[in-house]
């Protein structure tokens, strides 16, 4: 029920009550009839005063009553009882004609479904509604609402709809909410928090333009922030002190934002959170409670799943980023395994916190130090500091060959293969069924591994200057190749193939790769075809240089 409906109900209650019966005196130890200065009759009553109207009974120590106007004032242990409802206050003023009771001082209204305390209460007894002002405390369904003013009306389901304003605080077992104004509809069981609303639960602080709370069976089931959603989450972890010092327990603030937020709860505890529209997260990573670094991610939609830990406290279990996902991982300065920032992007990114793994899918790009990885699918194992890249997730057929992993290191030609494994700590990696280029030649191997900054090892590889690398006109084949960048290539044994047919072999061979320098080794031929000669190889030979400056 909205505010207008609440106020309308209060107005209707006043109108319909005007035809009701008046207060009737039941008892008073002393009754004195007097005429006031305006010539109106007034009853002064003292000692065990008791009045009744319908099901309502008022008792007090003293009071006065204007019978003609139906107005009475009562003080001294004042109490009004109606069925299971009890109202107490320092003093009470009644208007029988309008069925309005005004309570002053230490007001306390207790009902079977709710309780209320305030300094002032305008109470419509027949409609079971009212307006409480001054240090209001309203208790209902496990909630304690404090505010400067509360307007309420009891609904057909016995719960009360209300509007609370002025420094509102809502206390529940699992959470605390604050705002300038809140409206609760008891029939739909939905609260709207307005004017700088904030909800704090399990160390998380949620805020936005508005916060909507939907309850089911007296438990919060869904929290919605329709605009400018923001979450701040306090966490603790150990950081390394200065040299020789012990680790220090420090506080970290995870941060999440989005245009819209939806949080789903089970038994009142967070189960999942979905951020939509320019969503971002800042999440701090720990290993054995020791801070490792921070991860910043953004995308169209970010979904967080929560799970209870050993202490039953809910913590983030996984993060899923969809739609233009991108992020940055910044390792702590004390981290030993990864020393530099990792930049990455993909169509979707999924983090598993307990498994310490990340999965990136479709149009994946990862930049780390002097290396670049482009692929259709990448799995990062943070505990082992490994990246595993393939064109598509396991068990899914490759739809686009261009999604096969392509790995580039500074100073080297790109390498593409069916799969890639790369160690972020030591820079070593391997490519299955990989291809790459060095100078004028192309290399392909069942497995290509790097063992130093300038060394590649190739198993069951081929080398050719033909640009048809997948099906070359000619090539040299070898079980093992060792490529030393900008120096030479060593192969053993080596066989020359023409059109897939072996021509001759050697125990080993050395090919120069000097980027313009002179070096002894085989000179690769070129392939050609014409009407006079047919298919041919031209230029195969061996060059011996006494030193690198010969013929320069």
Locate the predicted segments by residue.
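Structural signature for solvent-exposed beta-strand/loop edge elements and short helix-capping sites
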Residues: 18-552
């Amino acid at each position: 029920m909205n505010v207008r409906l609440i106020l309308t109900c209060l107005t209707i209650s006043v109108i319909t009550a005007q035809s009701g019966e008046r207060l009737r005196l039941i008892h008073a130890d002393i009754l004195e009839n007097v005429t006031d200065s305006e010539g109106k009759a007034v009853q002064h009553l003292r000692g065990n005063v008791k009045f009744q109207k319908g099901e309502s009974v008022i008792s007090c120590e003293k009071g006065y009553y204007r019978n003609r106007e139906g107005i009475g004032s009562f003080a001294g242990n004042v109490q009004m009882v109606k069925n299971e409802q009890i109202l107490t206050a320092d003093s009470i003023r009644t208007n029988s004609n309008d069925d309005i009771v005004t309570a002053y001082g230490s007001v306390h209204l207790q009902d079977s479904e709710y309780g209320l305390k305030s300094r002032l209460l305008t109470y419509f007894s027949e409609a079971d509604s009212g307006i409480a002002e001054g240090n209001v405390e309203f208790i209902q369904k496990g909630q304690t609402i404090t505010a400067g003013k509360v307007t309420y009306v009891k609904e057909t389901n016995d719960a009360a709809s209300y509007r609370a304003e002025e420094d509102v605080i809502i206390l529940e077992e699992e959470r605390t909410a604050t705002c300038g104004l809140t409206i609760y509809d008891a029939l739909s069981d939905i609260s709207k928090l307005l004017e700088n609303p904030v909800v704090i639960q399990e160390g998380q602080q949620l805020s936005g333009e508005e916060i909507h709370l939907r309850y089911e069976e007296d438990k919060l089931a869904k929290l919605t922030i329709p605009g400018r959603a923001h979450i701040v989450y306090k966490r603790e972890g150990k950081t390394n002190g200065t040299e020789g010092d012990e680790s220090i327990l420090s506080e970290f603030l995870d941060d999440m934002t989005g245009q819209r937020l939806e949080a789903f709860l089970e038994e009142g505890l967070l189960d999942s959170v979905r951020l939509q529209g320019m969503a971002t997260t800042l999440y701090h990573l720990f290993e054995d409670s020791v801070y490792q670094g921070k991860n910043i991610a953004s995308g169209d939609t970010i979904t967080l799943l929560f799970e209870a830990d050993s202490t039953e406290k809910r913590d983030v279990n996984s993060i899923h980023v969809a739609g233009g996902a991108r992020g940055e991982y910044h390792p702590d300065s004390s981290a030993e395994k990864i020393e530099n920032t990792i930049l990455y992007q993909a169509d979707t990114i999924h983090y598993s916190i307990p498994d310490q793994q990340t999965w990136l899918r479709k149009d994946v790009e990862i930049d780390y130090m002097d290396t670049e990885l482009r692929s259709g699918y990448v799995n990062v194992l943070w505990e082992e500091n490994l990246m595993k890249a393939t064109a598509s997730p396991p068990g899914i057929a490759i739809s686009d060959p261009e999604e096969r992993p392509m790995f580039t290191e500074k100073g080297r030609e790109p390498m593409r293969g069916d799969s890639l494994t790369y160690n972020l700590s030591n820079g070593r990696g391997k490519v299955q069924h990989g291809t790459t280029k060095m100078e004028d030649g192309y290399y392909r191997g069942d497995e290509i591994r790097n063992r130093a900054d300038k060394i590649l090892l190739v198993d069951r590889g081929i080398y050719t200057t033909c640009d048809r690398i997948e099906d070359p006109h000619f090539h040299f084949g070898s079980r093992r190749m060792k490529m030393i960048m900008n120096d030479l290539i060593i192969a053993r044994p080596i066989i020359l193939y023409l059109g897939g047919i072996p021509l001759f072999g050697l125990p080993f061979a050395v090919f120069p790769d000097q980027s313009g320098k002179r070096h002894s080794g085989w000179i690769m031929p070129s392939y050609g075809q014409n009407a006079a000669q047919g298919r041919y190889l031209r230029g195969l030979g061996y060059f011996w240089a006494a030193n690198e400056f010969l013929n320069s």
